């Protein structure tokens, strides 16, 4: 899922943190790619014309293998050296999210069956993509393929994004590659997005710089993690009523998630107490007397006391109705963020989620060796052609490209030889009288300055 709304916040408040590149400009870079995200992406995107996943004659799914083989070759052809990182055991806190995803897949299956009966082809395709699930077999087959391609793959103890971030921090790779923005929350210094997208999409590679993002948001790393949790992450139920703008405002106003949670819980308790007090007041109010027709007096007129009582009753009912309307209106507004109606779930262990981001379960970068060698061509033919039904000609051509580009001596990048110095800011413009004389020079002033004489003011 990633972090909801984070990209939009960075575009608005830290635009300098995001750059777009053509893939060709990334030659010479080593990148740790979130393989688990890539498998899911390939199972959804690599399809037949009828929208079904690619399969061989035996009915086995091959979309993930097709995606990994050809997209990796494209990456390598552009001078990039990829290393793939696979998910390990998910954190305990994530199990609730995973169970909800399972429920949604089951719902999509039922809706998909119904769409086959009465829906359109587009409906069937949409629901079938929602039922995609990455299996243990998918992971094992992709790992086998990558080893035959001689592309490094790492099995993370837990979250793949966290391990990618660790490899980038440790200098093993230049950047982490993933579509999940929580890779930044795991402290990846550089994040590449869209790296494994198909060439047909013509989607530029998005590079996000964490340091520039923190500077633009005016936050330290701890506050950034707090912001990401408040926006909505994989480990906690999202807080209804909190959007990107309100989340940023709350963190800036209170300084951290601990203070934000305390503030929101206090406001929720105050609203609850106020509502209970109003309910008690309404319960204590006397019920209006029933309308009973009173007999006329001797003059044929109603008693004046009865008229006064009726008027009081009428006013009381009108006041009660108005109060009820105001209460309903207030309750409706209170559901959003404007009237402090944000409700934090009773069970919301944000401290535990924060520890997962700040101290993730990863293999230290200095204990990981990434090595790119010659591919096992005959092994690839045996696996992809004999076992999975791929075209032998295309597999051998792909293997030739891998051999050529993985072993080619990479051309050095200019930014590896030079240190880019920040541009010196121009001196501040003078204000008030005499400002014009310090601005654009008039004719003759250059000569006056060159001779060391001070130009006379007119």
From Swiss-Prot:
Residues 310-329, 442-452 have a biased composition (Basic and acidic residues). Mg(2+) 1 binds at residues 34, 87, 159, 161. It comes from Coprinopsis cinerea. This is Flap endonuclease 1. CDD domains: PIN_FEN1. Belongs to the XPG/RAD2 endonuclease family. FEN1 subfamily. Interacts with PCNA. Three molecules of FEN1 bind to one PCNA trimer with each molecule binding to one PCNA monomer. PCNA stimulates the nuclease activity without altering cleavage specificity. GO terms for molecular function: 5'-3' exonuclease activity; 5'-flap endonuclease activity; DNA binding; magnesium ion binding. The keyword Nuclease applies. Its cofactor is Mg(2+). Its EC number is 3.1.-.-. The gene is FEN1. Pfam families: XPG_I, XPG_N. InterPro entries: 5-3_exonuclease_C_sf, Flap_endonuc, HhH2, PIN-like_dom_sf, XPG-I_dom, XPG/Rad2, XPG_CS, XPG_DNA_repair_N. GO terms for cellular component: mitochondrion; nucleolus; nucleoplasm. Residues 1-105 are annotated as: N-domain. Binds 2 magnesium ions per subunit. They probably participate in the reaction catalyzed by the enzyme. May bind an additional third magnesium ion after substrate binding. Induction: Expressed throughout the meiotic cell cycle. It is an enzyme of class 3 (hydrolase). Residues 123-254 are annotated as: I-domain.
